[in-house]
Amino acid sequence: VSETHWTQSGETRLQSGETVIFSGHTEENAIHSEGVGFFLSKEASKALIQWEPVSSRIIVAKFRTQEKKINLVVIECYAPTNDAAEEQKDKFYDQLQAVMQGVSRKDIAIVMGDFNAKVGEANTGYELVMGKHGVGAMNENGEIFADFCLDNDIVIGGTVFAHRRKHKVTWVSPDHVTENQIDHICIARQFRRTLLDVRVKRGADAASDHHLL
């Protein structure tokens, strides 16, 4: 989950048995903004090896898989908005790049979250990491994000699978006029064939202007 607005970092077990791990601002009297986390099922909790609260915008969790020599590393992100200062964007992507460099090549890397990035339909120059099933046109954040994916050889899943538009747009404006595909799930290209689908799940009671992806 992205933009939780929770401060500090921690791990909480719910009465239902699920586990929440989260990362937010750590300063004293920190503002309730940004924030990322994971809601883990009982099965996922048992498979959890370790997790790291990188910042208020990045959290990393490593899980065991059925293949003994391969782990699953999931990186959840909340990127600065398109009109944010360049310094904020640079700091975010520098931190994310450092995390990526720490992931073993033999492990499955999933990078996901709210990137505030429109990558669009045209994939010229990005054919290795993008399909042609994006939405709209690429914006500045989208170009930064696509370049990051190209540099790290990770595929933007939402652009690969053909779906109706309503199952691709992840954010809807309060007046229901503007729709964008700004949340993404990406996977290391060497494991691309293990990603079976990426699509929006509409109608979830999540009190958010984003749909579940």
Where are each of the predicted segments found?
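A shared catalytic/ligand-binding motif for oxyanion handling
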Residues: 1-213
